[in-house]
């Protein structure tokens, strides 16, 4: 690549796109990389402010911005994704299928830390739809040393930085406890709220049982749903420290391994996560009945995508785990649950 006066560029090959920007009207290339400059092009180039041009001068070990952008694309792209053609050194990656987006954050930071190149993504651990933008790559200068390309590959490791976990059909059992609901003193509000959340995904509610605050009965109901083929069991009610609340003990008595009782999320601090073998058993706090967004909205898509969550996964929600209860909710396009 060499720099020359625009008036001297006739017959030369452009090594980058020439962009015209008219605010509110257009932002696009008037000439593409690889275009051979003609005499008639000179006034056009000058009209967009190009007094000098970079023209192609191929050197060993040097990559053009579009070549390097393709390399960054290949570090990111995975199954169920598609990428745009390079344009001005930029490439966009989009989802081709619905699922849960996973990002290797540590390796992403390592690649970006090399300088002169960038990969920007949306937040991971959230569901995406086919067609959604996932990431974009760009090289900062017009050319980059091939050696830096090799360092980027090494920093990224052997696996793509992005992954979409599919969400297959899941059968869900709901166990609701509380003497006030069981004895008909109040109407159950958990069931409708949970069904509305589940309806956003490929799920089937096998049934809902309403029980008194009896640990043995709650445990038996959990185990019955599991025997019937439930992929997940949701337990509602009885999650506080009140002496009549027996749900956490019932989940443990059913044989489930408690991952965490409590999460650094508001609303949702009294959330319980357990696994009965491979079956997730979730204890949902009362806020799920009335709050627009809670810890349940953060955990549900990850569980449905087959992730086996750990206490560390829940602990990481502390930063970003406070819902601001905005007058108009824009979740997930907000800070809630962003790690």
List each language-model region with its residue ranges.
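Glycine-rich phosphate/diphosphate-binding loop of Rossmann-like nucleotide-binding domains
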Residues: 158-213, 217
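C-terminal terminal segments
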Residues: 29, 85, 100-118, 126-129, ...
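Flexible, glycine/charged-enriched surface loops at secondary-structure junctions
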Residues: 55-56, 81-86, 144-146, 204-208, ...
């Amino acid at each position: 690549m060499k720099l020359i006066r625009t008036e001297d560029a006739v017959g030369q090959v452009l090594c980058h796109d020439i962009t015209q920007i008219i605010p509110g009207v257009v932002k696009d290339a008037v000439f593409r990389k690889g275009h051979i400059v003609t005499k008639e092009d000179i006034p056009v180039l000058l009209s967009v402010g190009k007094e000098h041009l970079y023209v192609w001068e191929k050197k060993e070990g040097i990559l053009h911005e579009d070549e390097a952008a393709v390399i960054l694309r290949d570090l990111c792209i995975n199954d169920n994704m598609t990428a745009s053609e390079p344009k001005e050194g930029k490439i966009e990656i989009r989802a081709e299928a619905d699922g849960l987006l996973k990002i290797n954050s540590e390796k992403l930071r390592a690649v970006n830390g090399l300088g002169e190149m960038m990969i920007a993504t949306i937040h991971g651990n959230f569901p995406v739809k086919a067609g959604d933008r996932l990431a974009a790559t760009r090289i900062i200068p017009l050319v980059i040393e091939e050696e830096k390309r090799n360092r980027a590959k090494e920093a990224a490791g052997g696996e793509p930085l992005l992954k979409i976990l599919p969400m297959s059909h899941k059968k869900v059992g709901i166990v609701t406890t509380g003497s006030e609901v069981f004895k008909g003193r109040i109407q159950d509000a958990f069931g409708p709220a949970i069904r509305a959340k589940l309806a956003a995904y490929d799920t089937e509610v096998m049934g809902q049982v309403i029980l008194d605050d009896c640990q043995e009965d709650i445990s038996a109901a959990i185990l019955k749903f599991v025997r019937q083929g439930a992929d997940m069991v949701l337990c509602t009610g009885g999650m506080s420290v009140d002496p009549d609340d027996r749900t956490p003990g019932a989940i443990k008595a059913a044989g489930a391994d408690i991952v965490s009782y409590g999460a650094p999320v508001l609303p949702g601090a009294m959330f319980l996560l357990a696994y009965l073998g491979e079956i997730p058993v979730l204890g949902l706090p009362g806020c799920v009945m009335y709050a627009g967004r809670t810890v349940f909205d953060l955990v549900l898509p990850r569980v449905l995508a087959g992730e086996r969550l750990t206490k560390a996964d829940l602990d990481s929600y502390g930063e970003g785990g406070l819902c601001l209860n905005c007058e108009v909710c824009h979740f997930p396009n907000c800070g809630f649950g962003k790690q």
